[in-house]
Amino acid sequence: MKDIKTIFKGFHRPLGLPAFLCPTGRLRKNEGKMLTKLVTFTDNCTYEIKKEKQGDWNKLFGVCFGILGIHRHSIRFGWRWNISKQKIEICYIIYDGKRIERTQIAFCDCELNREYHFNITWILKDDRTLDVTFHPLQYDVEEHLNVPIKARRFFGCGFYFGGKTRAPHRITAKLQQISKVI
């Protein structure tokens, strides 16, 4: 089933073609774009790794701008397992041109085996600035940001575990495309 994403032990992402190799669209001024997914984190999304890495963010989904934008110019939801809360924490991640995470603050929690809607909308305000909204639909939380970009062509960013740390065991989540206006 294509909605089920599995990252095998020792890997960063599900097998198959990386999402960033599949161009999804081009930005035009004042034209809105939207990506909404229904996400279910399964029991095996829990993990315990080295203490200094446990707080690192994994990637859920989003978009990057430009062919090499995956680590330089992207907007996406992030996730991590919080051992003390026994819940998945969700944040938004924005990379600037220096691959520095400017904002990584958990703004909602998810229980395992429940469905959650996540929505990202963006609109090109001027030649190089996006107005971005991150909205987990079950929560009364919405983040609006202005994000600088350097390219108008954008690509998908998919389910991913870690940075340098690889999946400690099989990690599975359901990411169902609900709407895609791009």
Task: Indicate where each model-derived feature is located.
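Secretory/extracellular carbohydrate-interaction modules
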Residues: 5-89
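Surface-exposed coil/turn segments at beta-strand junctions on protein surfaces, enriched
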Residues: 30, 109-113, 125, 166
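Extracellular beta-strand elements of beta-rich domains used
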Residues: 37, 171-181
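Short tryptophan-centered beta-strand motifs in secreted/extracellular beta-sheet-rich domains
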Residues: 37, 114-124, 130-132
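Short, aromatic/His-centered strand-loop micro-motif at the edge of beta-sheets
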Residues: 92-117
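Flexible glycan-contacting loops in extracellular carbohydrate-active proteins
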Residues: 142-174
